[in-house]
Amino acid sequence: MSHKIKIYDTCIGCTQCVRACPTDVLEMIPWQGCKAKQIASAPRTEDCVGCKRCESACPTDFLSVRVYLGSETTRSMGLAY
């Protein structure tokens, strides 16, 4: 089942979410916006099973990676920007 995955620019490039994902949905791509010069990307969202292990692994104060299940959206989660 596919789920919407959003990577926020608070990503510090630590790779914790990539290593936590049991279905290899996430990968790191080059990005100049952080010290690590890489950011998480979700090119294979169709493989996401919604376990949210990536969220649990994220060490930032505000989760840099979010998985929205079914009808959840940033608005329904109270995270609208």
Swiss-Prot record:
Catalytic reaction list: reduced [plastocyanin] + hnu + oxidized [2Fe-2S]-[ferredoxin] = oxidized [plastocyanin] + reduced [2Fe-2S]-[ferredoxin]
InterPro entries: 4Fe4S_Fe-S-bd, 4Fe4S_Fe_S_CS, PSI_iron-sulfur_center, PSI_PsaC
Class of enzymatic activity (EC top level): oxidoreductase
Coiled coil: none
Binding locations of [4Fe-4S] cluster 1: C11, C14, C17, C58
Gene3D superfamilies: 3.30.70.20
GO biological process: photosynthetic electron transport in photosystem I
Compartments (UniProt record): Plastid, Chloroplast thylakoid membrane
Domain 4Fe-4S ferredoxin-type: 2-31, 39-68
UniProtKB keywords: 4Fe-4S, Chloroplast, Electron transport, Iron, Iron-sulfur, Membrane, Metal-binding, Oxidoreductase, Photosynthesis, Photosystem I, Plastid, Repeat, Thylakoid, Transport
Record's GO cellular component terms: chloroplast thylakoid membrane; photosystem I
Membrane-topology annotation of the record: Peripheral membrane protein
Cofactor(s) recorded in Swiss-Prot or TrEMBL: [4Fe-4S] cluster
Enzyme Commission number, as recorded: 1.97.1.12
Cofactor note: Binds 2 [4Fe-4S] clusters. Cluster 2 is most probably the spectroscopically characterized electron acceptor FA and cluster 1 is most probably FB.
GO molecular function: 4 iron, 4 sulfur cluster binding; electron transfer activity; metal ion binding; oxidoreductase activity
Superkingdom field: Eukaryota
Annotated residues for binding of [4Fe-4S] cluster 2: C21, C48, C51, C54
Summary of subunit composition and partner proteins: The eukaryotic PSI reaction center is composed of at least 11 subunits.
General function of this protein: Apoprotein for the two 4Fe-4S centers FA and FB of photosystem I (PSI); essential for photochemical activity. FB is the terminal electron acceptor of PSI, donating electrons to ferredoxin. The C-terminus interacts with PsaA/B/D and helps assemble the protein into the PSI complex. Required for binding of PsaD and PsaE to PSI. PSI is a plastocyanin-ferredoxin oxidoreductase, converting photonic excitation into a charge separation, which transfers an electron from the donor P700 chlorophyll pair to the spectroscopically characterized acceptors A0, A1, FX, FA and FB in turn.
Name of the protein in its database record: Photosystem I iron-sulfur center
